[in-house]
Amino acid sequence: KNYGYFGDNHGNILCINLNNMKPVWYYDNHDDIDATIVCEEENGVPFVYTACEVDRQGDSGMCHIAKLNGLNGEVAWAVQVPCTRHNINNKHFDGGMYSTPLLGGGNCSDLIFSTLANDGVNGDGHFYAFEKRTGKVVYKTKLKHYAWSSPVGFYNEKNELFIVVGDTYGYLYLIEGKSGRVIYDERFGVNFESSPVVVGNTLVVGSRGQSVYKVHIG
């Protein structure tokens, strides 16, 4: 309860004792970390999940995704997904993970979800489900464009997980958590960068262009 975790732009993952502000352990995750670290307890042991983008690696590289023992920094598993830099009008957009991963619950308690940017060609992006125990990719669902916004979850009366995520072209997707099947998608905004706020069966999310959307999932 007294440990905190953070990552920086050089890929350093640090565990800090919050009682005395001294470092406990360190892990090198290779590249710039924008995605927020998430933590989940398993049998009394905290585990942290982290991933990087492709920035200092150059035009192409690997998104390094890792699960670490929160007490000592030992690697439970680490997987790599090839990603690239996307160049548009003399601007570049780094690939990899930007969104905060979503820890699955209910019928998806064995999974963790996130999006990866530029993990293909021409600005491709996919929504991924990873097995918490091994890091194995259970499925990946192609989006119309890559995503930076974090996925959020909804549960029905059967405790089945459904996920909403927005991409950088302004599309919102409703995805079945267990299978990755896209139930619904529609273009609402211009570019979703902010993460949705969920209240009950309703989400609120802002896009570029001074627009805020309220969407009911029913």
Residue locations for each model-derived region?
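Extracytoplasmic/lumenal domain signature
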Residues: K1-G218
